[in-house]
Swiss-Prot record:
Family listed: Belongs to the TRAFAC class OBG-HflX-like GTPase superfamily. OBG GTPase family.
First and last residue of the signal peptide: none
Gene coding for it: obg
Domain Obg: 1-162
Subunit: Monomer.
An individual GO BP term: ribosome biogenesis
Protein name as annotated: GTPase Obg
Length: 366
């Protein structure tokens, strides 16, 4: 499926059913009292996050969504049926923005809790039947309420992938090979830059405890100026905002002997320019493709990193060398760093059984 991380949709909740204007009519009871039932409430539009989806592609294909209307009330005090709710499943980590008529946006939901749901458009309340208005002073009310219209909203959906670890690096650093080594992900791998055009997700399973898992996001290669839109990284930098930590991979081919860690510093600067908080995010620094250099050259780099106080892992993702040490470090970080809090907490909204502010009545002839 094509990866899509933004979409705009229109949602409309169902209209409440009209209340019924009816009187009891039976043999030998010429003046039966009112017996009009209430209309059913309209169905609501509900958003439910799920980890089964990784793209908003379906919401690019279909943009309009409507819940069912409530049925009108009937005689003999029969209430109308409530309209069926429309439940839309969205990828876990989706941000929901309401867009007004002038194009202004306001975030209304952060779907980062797999057990949470959000009522984005509430169905209209059903109108009261004339039996509801019977009183000691009004024995035969000849009016009933109409149902309320359902809420309508225009929404912009923005997916920010929820992952434990984010893989970063310059193009052709070997991130895709690395993620294919440690998980069941099978991204496209080739010896040219920008092989990865969209984020790939992999799940690493603990060999001792199969229920212990780590989700890893392979972010497309970043280049200098990514925060301003250069290269491919500009669109995907947002996907690292919610990771617990980052795994920064640098190809040994990109190392300058005079200043070997420039590649790490360049990407870190791009992260900071995109969001200053990312500068402080925990990182694991990895030099990949050590099989392309002699053991003596690799040892010299190890010593230089140690002298400068940098803990850097040296690996060959192609041949599996050094992978186990990186994986152990990733598990340690995953277990010590909490997932980031949602930007907007979902709140349960209690339905209030209140009267209509403005009663719209339907009269019958005398």
């Amino acid at each position: 499926m094509r990866f899509v991380d933004e979409a705009t949709i229109n949602v409309r909740a169902g209209k409440g059913g009209n209340g019924c204007l009816s009187f009891r009519r039976e043999k030998f009871i010429p003046r039966g009292g009112p017996d009009g039932g209430n209309g059913g409430d309209g169905g609501s539009v509900i958003l439910r996050p799920t980890n089964r989806l990784l793209s908003l592609y379906d919401f690019r294909l279909q943009r309009n969504y409507e819940a069912r209307n409530g049925q009108s009330g009937m005689g003999s005090q029969c209430d109308g049926r409530k309209g069926e709710d429309l439940v839309l499943e969205l990828p876990l980590g989706t941000l929901v923005f309401e867009v007004d008529d002038e194009g202004h946006e306001q975030m209304i939901a952060d779907l980062s809790d797999p057990d949470g749901v959000f009522v984005v458009a509430r169905g209209g309340r059903g109108g009261k039947g004339n039996e509801h208005f019977k009183s000691s002073t009004m024995r035969a009310p000849r009016f009933a309420q109409k149902g309320e219209p359902g809420e309508e909203r225009r929404l912009r959906l923005e997916l920010k992938i929820l992952a434990d670890a984010g893989l970063l690096g310059l193009p052709n650093a070997g991130k895709s090979t690395f993620i294919s080594r440690i998980s069941a992900a099978r991204p496209k791998i080739a010896a040219y830059p920008f092989t990865t055009l969209t984020p790939n997700l992999g799940v690493m399973i603990d060999e001792v405890d199969p229920d212990r898992r780590m989700v890893i996001a392979d972010i497309p290669g970043l280049i200098e100026g990514a925060h301003t839109g250069q290269g491919l990284g500009h669109r995907f930098l947002k996907h690292v905002e919610r990771t617990r930590f980052l795994v920064h991979i640098l190809s040994i081919e990109d190392i300058d002997p005079e200043n070997p860690w420039t590649g790490f510093d360049l990407i870190n600067e791009e992260l900071a320019r995109f969001d200053e908080v990312l500068r402080e995010r925990e990182q694991i620094e990895v030099v990949n493709k050590i099989d392309l250099r002699t053991p003596e050259e690799v040892d010299a780099l190890r010593q230089q990193a140690a002298q400068q106080g940098r803990r850097i892992f040296f690996i060959s993702a192609m041949h599996g060398e050094g992978i186990e040490e990186v994986v152990d470090a990733m598990w340690r970080l995953r277990d010590t760093i909490d997932m980031h809090e949602p930007l907007v907490h979902l709140q349960e909204v209690e339905e209030e059984d209140e009267e209509f502010e403005d009663i719209e009545v339907v009269y019958t002839r005398e």
